[in-house]
Amino acid sequence: MNQEELFDVTVIGGGPAGLYSAFYSGLREMKTKIIEFQPQLGGKIHVYPEKMIWDIGGLLPVTGEKLIEQLVQQGLTFQPEVVLNTKIESIIRNQDGIFTLKTSSGEEHFSKTVIVATGSGILNPQKLSIEGAERFEVSNLNYTVKSLKRFKDKTVIISGGGNSAIDWANELEPIAKKVYLTYRKEELSGHEAQVKQLMNSSAECFFNTSITKLIAGDNHEAIEYVELTNHETGEVSHLSIDEVIINHGYERDITLLENSELDVAIVDNYYIAGNANSESSVDGLYAAGDILKHDGKLHLIAGAFQDAGNAVNKAKQFIQPDASEYGMVSSHNEVFKKRNRELIKQMMK
């Protein structure tokens, strides 16, 4: 390892927490790297690009897609090194205190500190467990909603009873011809307000019921009917549909922490047990965003930004113990003087 390969901060994860960590560590003049498993930055927000996000202070309602664009632009302000399509499988600490991050392809990355910002983990949607279902993924079997327009004036059935399924049912109900929701249990498990909205809408719900068969049309390329089975009565029915959406949750890949030789405290079999300063049980290793769990945690995107700032501040002091506890606010920070002048010139045109 040479000094060019050694970074002050390596952020694992390129979602909101990871991107803000990169921005703030650049603000604090640290050499920064982002490593992201997906082929693009943005994290889980890519799952809902057309959903409106209201709960970020000072930011007017914005689509997920637009928020990603802004987060990426901000996160790259100080030109961190970005490594995409790369899965970190383990973290070890060398005798000199430097962290070595090993990838699934055998590559190694070296860093003085690490911020884990992997959100809910590497997420893979749980597929519909019906033989032959995968062949319809190229036509009308969906595991996410990338465009609301696709479902305009269509008859749609959604399978699932959690927040994602309920949210999409509420989003699509005003624009689809008809929305059905089927759930294997007796009661929905989403947020109370969202459930109430759904039950007061024109959407039709089937409880204790699952999709048990997908029936293709004459062209054998798309689903034309779904078979529904009620688990209590055994009754079987068929619905004519245009689109099927499956929201059965996600399978988490947690090999990163399972393979780590570090004694990282974990809660609920996944989350990093930390504190309000984003510190973990391992000195020099911090967490930000959904992966971090502690009393008083704010489970919003805005909370991820606070986690990120705290993690960076602690990383800065870990590397440089006499450094200021906090970074200078942007309105008085020397690093922005030139940029501010350029922005003001543009505003005056």
Curated annotation (Swiss-Prot):
Keyword Flavoprotein in the entry? The reply is: yes
Top EC category: oxidoreductase
The residues the record assigns to binding FAD are: E36, K44, Y48, I88, L123, D290, S331
* InterPro entries in the cross-refs: FAD/NAD-bd_sf, FAD/NAD-binding_dom, Fd--NADP_Rdtase_type_2, Ferredoxin-NADP_redctase_2
> Which Pfam families does the protein's record reference?
Pyr_redox_2 (PF07992)
> What's its EC?
1.18.1.2
Source species, domain of life:
Bacteria
What quaternary structure, including any partners, is listed in this protein's UniProt entry?
Homodimer.
Q: What is this protein called?
A: Ferredoxin--NADP reductase 1
Q: Which organism is it from?
A: Bacillus mycoides (strain KBAB4)
Q: Organism classification, top ranks?
A: Bacteria, Bacillati, Bacillota, Bacilli, Bacillales
